[in-house]
């Protein structure tokens, strides 16, 4: 599906490159970032879903949604868009797409309340969390040509 309202693949790839470059600078020990805020998900995928997106430093991103997978497949050029029910599934679903989580990941901590953050960490044993809020803020601060049109 192609529409002027849809986020072009080139724009998404540009955003990924910018986020990855910032991750390497601001959080060089992480293997990628897990974004849970709806605004962050939209920025990285072009669809406004309830779930999360895993953007590894190397490899393909994975969008996991609680619902609305069919709509996301129409709106987003991502190859890996899957449903999920529990945070316990995140590790295996990402690995199944060829983009496994690393032992250290960046998470948009502003997108979580205290209890949700604790639940996510308890479901992902052995994974160390750091913040990617500065990465997202800096990436979104500089507008691309497409965003300025």
Model regions: which residues?
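Conserved beta-strand termini and adjacent loop/short-helix elements that scaffold enzyme active sites
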Residues: 35-36, 64-66, 83-86, 130-134
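Terminal domain-start leader segments
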Residues: 1-60
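Short, polar loop motifs at secondary-structure junctions
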Residues: 38-39, 65-71, 111-116
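Flexible, acidic/His-enriched mid-domain "rim/lid" segments that flank
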Residues: 2-3, 11, 16, 89-149
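Short, structured coil segments at secondary-structure junctions
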Residues: 57, 76-79, 123-125
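Conserved acidic residues
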Residues: 31, 79, 103
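Compact, glycine/acidic-enriched structural inserts
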Residues: 65-92
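Short internal beta-strands
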Residues: 54-67, 107
